[in-house]
Amino acid sequence: MTTLASDHPVSLPDDLPGWLRRDLRSDHAGESGAVEIYRGILAVSGSQDVRAFAREHLRTESRHLRLMDALVPPEQRSRLTWLWRLAGWVTGALPALFGPRAVFRTIEAVETFVDGHYAEQLTALANA
């Protein structure tokens, strides 16, 4: 069992089905990329509003990543995590070059995708 900084124990059974392990691996990669989106924004944006938004969301996504780190053992994580991190950073930095509107539109698109992805996973869990 792993304990997070918030002292909430986290453990998963050893007999999780393969599809659920794959979903968790995907979610871990996604959270890794999400952290980098906000780091990319912070590296490029000069807008104080955008930077405040990015700092707040970076804290949230960092908590999510810590949870996923606790749930998914290193040997079960995607071998392409480095690529998802790079893609995340570029996904944040590139729109930040074009200003706040581009940043917020990009985040809206990413979050819309993520909401759909998690909805599919919840449906799969409900039907398992």
Where are these regions (language model features)?
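Non-heme di-metal
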Residues: 1-128
